[in-house]
Structures are given as structure tokens and as C-alpha cells.
């Protein structure tokens, strides 16, 4: 489908880039600008990013932005329940690609907690995340081909609780269809309260997924649907 065929809700922005490199640089510049505004207004800022392979170039570009990183807190939208030393750790990814150079001065608050069970780890993380200076100032989300975002997976056990717009938890246990299955995620109530919300996607398959998500009425079928409303801006390249 053509990007022009996308029928976005009122208040949802769209930025189209020509390549992955352009998207990474442009997204980093927008995030940096929003963080500067937050710092100017309130003296500190909270940035929440997503993991996976797609954000690497963006994280590296953002690490080079001239910011007062010492006044910025960085956290994750979700995490695989693995130690930071594990290859699948989102925290490890952020430390390698974002928290370097001047950006290493940022305060990082991760989700992973060692525990006897995923549920216990989520409870520990929930307590730990009370250090986050909510609400989130800038949130950068991704999206899977199944319409998940963060670790809010369609039909996953615990999804109803995680999608509760009035929920009070800051971290919940979730199960993913792909390995590693055990995940920790910020719930909808925390994510949707972010002041600036950005969704970074790439390619025709993600465009088709986005179009399908816009058409569903039951957000549990494609959880990203819950975020496809103002103040979201979508960053896409073909």
C-alpha cells in the first residue's frame, strides 16, 4: 500500500524518511530537541526507549547529540528477562549503543531483576521503577508484525491487566511468542501518559501492520492500536 492511503486519527503526525540512516538521524534530532525542551522547562527529563535490532542506528545517533545528559534519566519500555550480560538484553543494547561518550552521564534505570520467577522479578522491578520521574517526557516505541509494542503481545496472559488505562503498576510480567519468552514491560497506563510519543517503523510490512491496527476495534488483538492517537508521531521509511 502507499503511505498516502493511511487514514490516521486526528492529531497523529507522520514523518516519512528516505532511508534507515535518515530516519535514525531525524528521529535522534527530534528526540534531542524534545529533551532539551523538557530540561529547559523542568530541569530534568525522562527518556524511555525500546530494544531490539531496529533502534541501534537511532541510539548511536542520539548518543552524539549535544545534551546535558547528567540531567536525563533513561529507561526501557520493556525488557527480556535475562541478565544485562546476555546478548538479548535490552539494557545491554542501550549501554553499548546509547550510553557512551557524554551520554554515559545519563542515569539509567533498567527493568531486569534477578528473582525466582518472572512474577517476582516484575514485582521487584515495579518497586525499583518508583525511582522513575514520571510522567515520561519522551517515549520511543517500535512495533512488531503482530501489532505488539513494548512487550504488550496479542492474546498474551496478563494482557488485560497490562492494557488497563487506569492501572497503577509500573512493571508487569508478560510472555512473548518468540525466544526469550519471558518479558517485563511498562504497562499501557505508564506508556500512554508520555508527553511525547514517537513510533519508529520501517518497510512495507510494518506499514501494512499499522494499517491493520488502525482498523481493529479490540485493542487486545493488536495492542499498538492503544497508542495510535494524539500525541503520537509516526516515523517511517520504505
Curated annotation (Swiss-Prot):
It catalyses: 6-phospho-D-glucono-1,5-lactone + H2O = 6-phospho-D-gluconate + H(+). The keyword Hydrolase applies. The keyword Lipid metabolism does not apply. Keywords: Hydrolase. Gene3D superfamilies: 3.40.50.1360. It is an enzyme of class 3 (hydrolase). Its EC number is 3.1.1.31. GO terms for molecular function: 6-phosphogluconolactonase activity. GO terms for biological process: carbohydrate metabolic process; pentose-phosphate shunt. Signal peptide: none annotated. CDD domains: 6PGL. InterPro entries: 6-phosphogluconolactonase_DevB, Glc/Gal-6P_isomerase, NagB/RpiA_transferase-like, PGLS. Pathway: Carbohydrate degradation; pentose phosphate pathway; D-ribulose 5-phosphate from D-glucose 6-phosphate (oxidative stage): step 2/3. Hydrolysis of 6-phosphogluconolactone to 6-phosphogluconate. Belongs to the glucosamine/galactosamine-6-phosphate isomerase family. 6-phosphogluconolactonase subfamily. This is 6-phosphogluconolactonase. It comes from Pseudomonas aeruginosa (strain ATCC 15692 / DSM 22644 / CIP 104116 / JCM 14847 / LMG 12228 / 1C / PRS 101 / PAO1).
Amino acid at each position: 500500500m502507499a503511505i498516502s492511503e493511511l487514514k490516521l486519527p486526528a492529531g497523529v503526525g507522520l514523518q516519512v524518511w528516505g532511508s534507515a540512516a535518515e530516519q535514525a538521524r531525524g528521529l535522534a534530532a527530534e528526540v534531542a530537541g524534545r529533551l532539551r525542551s523538557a530540561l529547559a522547562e523542568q530541569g530534568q527529563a525522562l527518556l524511555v526507549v525500546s530494544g531490539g535490532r531496529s533502534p541501534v542506528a537511532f541510539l548511536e545517533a542520539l548518543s552524539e547529540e549535544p545534551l546535558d545528559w547528567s540531567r536525563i534519566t533513561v529507561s526501557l519500555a520493556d525488557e527480556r528477562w535475562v541478565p544485562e550480560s546476555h546478548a538479548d538484553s535490552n539494557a545491554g543494547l542501550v549501554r553499548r549503543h546509547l550510553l557512551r561518550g557524554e551520554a554515559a552521564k545519563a542515569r539509567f534505570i533498567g527493568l531486569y531483576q534477578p528473582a525466582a520467577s518472572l512474577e517476582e522479578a516484575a514485582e521487584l522491578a515495579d518497586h525499583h521503577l518508583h525511582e522513575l520521574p514520571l510522567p515520561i517526557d519522551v517515549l520511543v516505541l517500535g512495533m512488531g508484525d503482530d501489532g505488539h509494542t513494548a512487550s504488550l503481545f496479542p492474546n498474551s496472559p496478563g494482557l488485560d491487566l497490562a492494557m488497563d488505562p487506569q492501572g497503577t503498576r509500573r512493571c508487569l510480567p508478560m510472555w512473548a511468542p518468540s525466544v526469550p519468552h519471558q518479558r517485563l514491560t511498562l504497562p499501557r497506563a505508564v506508556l500512554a501518559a508520555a508527553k511525547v510519543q514517537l513510533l519508529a517503523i520501517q518497510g512495507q510490512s510494518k506499514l501494512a501492520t499499522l494499517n491493520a491496527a488502525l482498523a481493529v476495534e479490540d485493542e487486545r488483538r493488536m495492542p499498538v492500536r492503544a497508542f495510535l492517537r494524539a500525541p503520537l508521531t509516526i516515523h517511517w521509511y520504505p
